[in-house]
């Protein structure tokens, strides 16, 4: 899930400070609005990358961490009946739920990098990251639920929906191209027919002119013959 930059441009001191701030657990801060905004931006970037992944690749084949098998096994052992296609926020945020989630999350401290970082989690897995469909959760909680959604086939709804839309766009674009090609061909054929027709008319006129001239010459020849006959007599 990590992304790297291909540039070696110097990083400003301000960005270094923000990066350092984001490398610390969320509980290290109070309600600092700047830090909260930085956390929100980082969480949103993570969400965008993840949504693009499950939209472009069959989620059943995705591997989110090096320990997906362990996360999934522990998750279903501790939350066997938890519904994950549409989450109930109370199953994640209530005091009793937090008590149950805490030992599970701490088990991955040192195993999963940034295990307790704030991450955006979708409530309804068939929908995208909207304000109404998103809650904040520790990253290990995000991994546990999303790995389960991928393996159990729930996230495939997003993949199928996006692929269907792209397929429709392709069909529509193909139809437009074929229509344009047909118009061009008709225009071209019409032009050729028009040119041919014009040539035929010109040829007809030329033939008529030649015929008329031929007739006149014939009449003149007849006159000359008649004159010769009269002289001969």
Swiss-Prot record:
Transmembrane residue ranges: none
Stretch list, region Disordered: 167-233
InterPro entries hit by this protein: PBDC1-like_dom_sf, PBDC1_metazoa/fungi, Polysacc_synth_dom
Species per Swiss-Prot/TrEMBL record: Homo sapiens (Human)
Short name of one Pfam family: PBDC1
Entry keywords, A to Z: Phosphoprotein
Phosphoserine modified-residue sites: 126, 181, 197
Protein name: Protein PBDC1
PANTHER family given in the database record: PROTEIN PBDC1
Protein family membership: Belongs to the PBDC1 family.
Keyword Phosphoprotein: yes
